[in-house]
Amino acid sequence: MKKLFATAGMLMFFGVVFAGGLLTNGNQSAQYIRMLSRNASTTYDAVYFNPAGLMKMDNGFYVAIHSQTLFQTKTITSGYPYLNDSKYEGEVTVPVFPTGFAIYKLDKVAFSLGFGPNSGGGSAEYGEGLPSFEKTISGLVPGLAGLAKLNQNVTNYKTAISFKGESIFWGIQGGASYKINDMFAVYGGARYVPATNTYTGYIKNIEVKVNGAFKNAATFLGNEIAPALKGMANQSTAAASSVQPLISGGAGGLTLAQANGAGLITAAQRAQLEGGLLGLGVTSAQISAMPITTVQGTYNAGAATLNGQAAQMTATGAQLADKSVDVKQTGSGITPIIGVNITPVEGLNIGMKYEFKTTLKLTNATTIDGTGMFPDGAETSSDLPALFSVGADYKVNPDMNFSISYNNYNDKGVDWGKNIYGEPRTISDNCWELSVGAQRTIVKGLAVSVGYLHTDMGVTHEFNSDFSYYSNSNTFGAGFEIKPMANLTIDLGMLLTNYASAAKSFKDTNPAVGNYVEMYDKHNLGFAIGLGYHFGAK
């Protein structure tokens, strides 16, 4: 049963990233939501996407506050045959996903600050658990089929499972940009990443249907079946002891029929001993040929087996008792960042940025650990991979511009640990993203934009599990930029992400199950609004 909650130990793989790499959120502004290509930005969100590009802004002090509302639906369909329901759905909801930027630009230098959820930022809730939580419980039905010999027919199960996780890795970034000349500008800075993951969940009220009625599984196995098996073991031990006088008297080589014929045991005693042997699985033919010494050995072996089964039922019953988890993990890391902005010709701007790997360890603060899986104070590595980004923006005319962006996450440089099935989470290729966007001014103060983003995750079959899975995706964004006055900018945007279905094949150790497949699906929907103000604009 420990396996049922082992998934929660992989906190860094909770999977509430909405746009970006395996852990990194790329959706850092409303401008991004409506255009999806921002790596050559020269306005407010350049603080995150292209900090060297801040040198293209006019002098003054700038402040922008953006927020997004994000929804993600995860659907898992399992082919495991013993589950009561093959479909599991989880909802990830982020009502407020805030980001903010502040810039002070003066001639050849600019200082900037930014904040936002660098990873995570939401909560996911599985009201009916996950297949990996329930498989062990559903296996009780075939696993207890042998109890039919005790006239205890187990035909179904039910349980209450719930799991909720929240993850937020904040990013608080600061740095300085410097204009070398009209063509080149550079940036140096860092991002402080305080991280928190919170996990709560329970598995309770596990019941099995026995002879048509549901019973508490822990009580049934521990208080009914285990004592019954123990009683049968005691009877076997007594039967073995009852034939010892015959063996001591030299009749150990006789069969029960011969001992009865010789008057050493009565017909009733013979019938009782033979009935006990039949109960242990010995055939009538074997009993007829079995000497009394073997009868005694069979009863002793049967007693040992029954005692072992009783102990197993007691242990299994204890594992099926209600279990809860309430764990919080915290930690922090630093991300060094450098950037370059290049303007080779008028109208063309190129931005480049490199974020170094962030070393980050999370420490358990455990309130409830009914599984023994989350020792208080234990540490877990949750490094963030390095990121290289480059983009270009071309202004066709004062009313129209196009942009293209590329991101590459060095996922191979991070140890991703193992998934809940014990498989190493390996990377076949580093995650990369390619996006294009366009913006056109319709009338003075109003522009419309659209964007497209393709993400290739580069994960292997072993990487995914029902707890955390990734697949290639296509994202579409659109929105508006509104300027009611020269120093105020309002951004409105929405995006929709479609993920390719991911399949994971399993080979169960139970021959009756054999091979089966789980399908993983999800989709995102997001809305954003942003307000930017330039103090001192003319």
Protein language model features and the residues they cover:
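N-terminal, post-signal peptide beta-strand-biased segments of exported outer-membrane/organellar beta-barrel
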Residues: G15-E125, Y469, L495
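Transmembrane beta-strands of outer-membrane beta-barrel pores
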Residues: S67-T73, F115-S119, Y192-T196, Y354-L360, ...
